[in-house]
């Protein structure tokens, strides 16, 4: 008796859909967790930088006495656009998110002022008005020197004269007022140190970041976000 041979048909084995869905959700969760952990680490490191700079500011404030006239409601340094790096931008966005959780109306006010500023400034913005990144080079620097010098910062509350994101303000804001050394020498706010001699001003010099921690953190932030280059406050607070 001859046996009839049947050709075996391969059975395509597929993982059950619920199992695949679980695997996908787990992978997404792990990815999101890693992103959040990296972001938290960056925020923690930035907090260390802020503490270092604020400690230096407290020290120079004590040494300067009445020569340093910075006070709530003094807004001269809040007028005029200035470049900020991606570490500053990250800190500002985090501060705006925190304000959103406690005072959503005030946060929306910041966003509205930022959007209005972009609408006014985009036509002459010395960079990419879509990404908000400033152009680099001597010509770009020359154009920026004449750009938005009378534009108030979107974080400035026009009713109170206070900064809505004071604890998250950029490094430029944190060191404006006391004597700080740059490539051009020792600079000081024109409202401060009236009557002080050059020697007295030099004795109050602020050294905000002696180990240049900011550069190290900026490199990490740019690698994490994939965005490099400077922007202005309005572009990082508009959305």
Language model features: what each stretch is:
Residues 1-36:
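N-terminal amphipathic/basic-hydrophobic helices that include classical n-h-c signal peptides
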Residues 28-76, 80-239:
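Short loop/turn segments that flank or connect secondary-structure elements
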């Amino acid at each position: 008796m001859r046996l009839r041979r049947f050709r075996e048909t391969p059975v395509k084995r597929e993982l059950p859909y619920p199992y695949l869905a679980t695997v996908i959700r787990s992978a997404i969760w792990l990815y999101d967790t890693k992103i959040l952990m990296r972001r938290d680490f960056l925020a923690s490191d930035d907090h260390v930088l802020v503490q270092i700079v604020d400690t230096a500011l407290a020290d120079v404030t004590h040494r300067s006495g009445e020569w340093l006239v910075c006070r709530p409601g003094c807004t001269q340094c809040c007028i005029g656009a200035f470049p900020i790096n991606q570490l500053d931008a990250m800190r500002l966005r985090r501060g705006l998110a925190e304000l959103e959780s406690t005072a959503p109306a005030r946060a929306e006010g910041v966003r509205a002022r930022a959007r209005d500023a972009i609408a006014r400034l985009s036509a002459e913005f010395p960079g990419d008005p879509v990404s908000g990144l400033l152009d680099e080079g001597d010509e770009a620097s020359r154009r920026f020197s004449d750009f938005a010098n009378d534009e108030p910062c979107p974080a400035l509350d026009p009713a109170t004269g206070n900064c809505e994101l004071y604890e998250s303000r950029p490094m430029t804001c944190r060191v404006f007022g006391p004597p700080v050394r740059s490539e051009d020498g020792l600079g000081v706010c024109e409202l401060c140190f009236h009557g002080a001699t050059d020697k007295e001003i030099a004795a109050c010099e602020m050294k905000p970041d002696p180990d240049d921690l900011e550069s190290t953190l900026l490199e990490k932030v740019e690698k994490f976000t994939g965005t490099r280059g400077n922007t202005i406050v309005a572009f990082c607070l508009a959305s």
